[in-house]
C-alpha cells in the first residue's frame, strides 16, 4: 500500500505520509507606487466626445496628429508640451461636444471637429488599371500630411478605415487630385461637460488633475469634488486651478501668474499645464520649491518682495525671477487655516505627497492582499503590521520621512470582527527652504 500524500487544508489525514503544500509568496508588496500621471479636460478640434482617453508621453510625441489633430510642434499644443515635460501619462477628456464630422463623397472624418476639414482624399488609377476593370490607389492626407495609402483598390467597399476617416463603402471611386472633407465643427463647451469629466475620471488613478477654466463656478466645482474624493472616497491626489486660493484646502493648488502681455481679460491660465505635470511627476521625496520653469510660455513675474510674501501667506503658488530663470517661490497649496489638529505642515505640497503616498499605497496593499483573504486574527494583524513597517522603512530609506519608530505603529482589532484599526505616526521630511545663519567674527 502506498503511503499517503498530496496537499492539505487541515491536519486531519489518516494515512502516514508526506502532505506538502506549495504556495507562492504573496504578489502584493509594500513597495512604493510610481508617480507621474495626470488628468486634464481640454477643448479639442479633433477627437471623440464624452470619453476618457489616456496618452503616454511617447504617444504624445509620436502620434499627436492622430490623437489631437495637430503635429507635435504646433503652437496649439504648447500647453500639452508643457504638461508632458514631467509626466509619464495623462487621462484626457474632450470638453466640447455636439460638433459635426467633416465629410466628402468618399469618406467621413473619424471624429468631429474643424480639423476634419483638413482631410483630403486623392485617387489615381493604379498600375494595371483598365477602362473595363479600373483599379485605384487611394491616399488620405491630414493637414497636408500623407497619413494613409491603399493601393490596387477595385471599389470603395474594399477600403479599410484608418485613424482619420471612415470610408463610404457605396461611393463610386474616380480620379481626383484632391477632394477635401468639409462641414466639420467643434461644437460647444458646456458647464455640464466639466461635471461629466469629473464623473468619468473617478475610476482612474492619477496624481494631479487640473483645468485652465477661469470661471469661479467651475473652479469651485473642481475644488469641492477634490475635497470629496480625498476626504470621503479616500482617493488621494491634488487639483491645480488658476487663481483660486479661496479653496483653503491642502488638496488644491492655486497658480497665480499670468503670461507676459496678458491683461485681466485675456489671461490664459496656461501655466496650469506645467504645474499639473510638475506636481504629478515630482517624486515623493522631492519638492518643487525653487524649481525652474522649463516650459515654453513667457511668465509674468513682475512682483515686489511684499507681493511675494503676501502670496505665500495667502496660499498661492507663485513664480518669481531669479537672475535669468523663472522659479517657483515655494511649493505650497491653498491651505492656510491652521488649527491644533492640522498644522501649517499641511500647506507644504511635499508633506501632502508623502501623506498621499502612504494613503494610496496602504489602501492598495490592504485591498489587494488582505481584503477578504486574510483572517482578522493576531497573525493576520501582525502580517499587516509588518507590511506597513516595510513600506515606511522604504519611505525612510529615500528620506521622505524620518525618525520612524515601528514600535509606535499599532494594528489592532476594531469594534467589529471585520474591522482593523491602524494607528500610525510619521514625520515627513521637507526640503531646505530657509537658511538662518549667524556668523561670529573674532
Enumerate the language-model features and the residues they cover.
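C-terminal edge-of-domain segments
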Residues: 410-442
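A glycine- and small-residue-enriched flexible loop/hinge signal that marks low-structured segments
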Residues: 2-48, 52-60, 65-68, 72-375, ...
Amino acid at each position: 500500500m502506498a503511503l499517503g500524500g498530496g496537499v492539505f487544508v487541515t491536519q486531519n489525514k489518516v494515512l502516514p505520509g508526506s502532505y506538502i503544500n506549495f504556495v507562492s509568496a504573496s504578489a502584493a508588496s509594500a513597495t512604493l507606487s510610481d508617480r507621474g500621471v495626470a488628468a486634464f479636460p481640454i477643448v479639442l478640434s479633433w477627437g471623440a466626445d464624452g470619453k476618457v482617453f489616456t496618452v503616454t508621453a511617447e504617444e504624445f510625441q509620436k502620434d499627436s496628429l492622430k490623437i489631437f489633430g495637430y503635429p507635435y510642434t504646433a503652437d496649439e499644443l504648447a500647453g500639452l508640451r508643457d504638461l508632458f515635460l514631467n509626466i509619464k501619462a495623462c487621462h484626457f477628456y474632450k470638453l466640447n461636444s455636439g460638433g459635426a464630422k467633416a465629410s466628402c463623397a468618399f469618406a467621413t472624418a473619424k471624429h468631429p471637429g474643424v480639423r476634419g476639414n483638413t482631410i483630403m482624399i486623392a485617387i489615381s488609377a493604379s498600375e494595371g488599371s483598365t477602362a473595363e476593370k479600373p483599379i485605384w490607389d487611394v491616399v488620405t492626407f491630414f493637414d497636408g500630411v500623407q497619413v494613409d495609402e491603399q493601393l490596387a483598390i477595385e471599389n470603395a467597399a474594399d477600403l479599410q478605415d484608418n485613424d482619420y476617416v471612415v470610408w463610404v463603402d457605396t461611393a463610386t471611386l474616380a480620379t481626383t487630385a484632391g477632394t477635401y472633407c468639409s462641414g466639420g465643427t467643434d461644437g460647444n463647451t458646456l458647464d455640464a461637460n466639466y461635471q461629466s469629466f469629473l464623473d468619468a475620471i473617478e475610476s482612474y488613478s492619477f496624481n494631479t488633475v487640473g483645468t485652465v477654466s477661469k470661471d469661479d463656478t467651475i473652479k469651485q466645482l473642481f475644488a469641492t469634488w477634490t475635497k470629496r474624493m480625498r476626504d470621503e472616497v479616500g482617493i488621494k491626489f491634488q487639483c491645480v486651478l488658476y487663481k483660486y486660493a479661496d479653496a483653503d484646502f491642502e488638496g488644491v493648488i492655486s497658480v497665480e501668474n499670468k503670461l507676459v502681455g496678458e491683461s485681466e481679460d485675456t489671461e490664459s491660465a496656461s501655466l496650469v499645464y506645467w504645474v499639473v505635470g510638475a506636481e504629478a511627476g515630482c517624486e515623493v521625496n522631492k519638492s518643487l520649491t525653487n524649481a525652474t520653469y522649463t516650459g515654453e510660455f513667457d511668465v509674468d513675474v513682475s512682483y515686489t518682495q511684499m507681493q511675494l510674501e503676501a502670496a505665500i501667506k495667502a496660499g498661492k503658488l507663485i513664480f518669481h525671477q531669479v537672475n535669468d530663470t523663472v522659479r517657483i517661490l515655494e511649493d505650497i497649496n491653498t491651505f492656510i487655516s491652521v488649527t491644533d489638529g492640522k498644522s501649517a505642515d499641511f500647506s507644504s505640497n511635499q508633506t501632502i505627497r508623502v501623506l498621499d503616498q502612504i494613503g494610496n499605497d496602504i489602501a492598495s496593499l490592504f485591498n489587494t492582499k488582505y481584503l477578504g483573504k486574510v483572517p482578522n486574527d493576531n497573525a493576520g494583524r501582525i502580517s499587516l503590521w509588518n507590511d506597513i513597517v516595510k513600506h515606511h522603512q522604504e519611505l525612510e530609506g529615500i528620506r521622505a520621512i524620518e525618525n520612524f519608530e515601528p514600535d509606535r505603529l499599532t494594528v489592532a482589532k476594531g469594534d467589529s470582527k471585520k474591522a482593523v484599526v491602524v494607528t500610525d505616526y510619521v514625520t515627513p521630511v521637507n526640503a531646505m527652504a530657509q537658511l538662518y545663519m549667524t556668523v561670529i567674527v573674532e
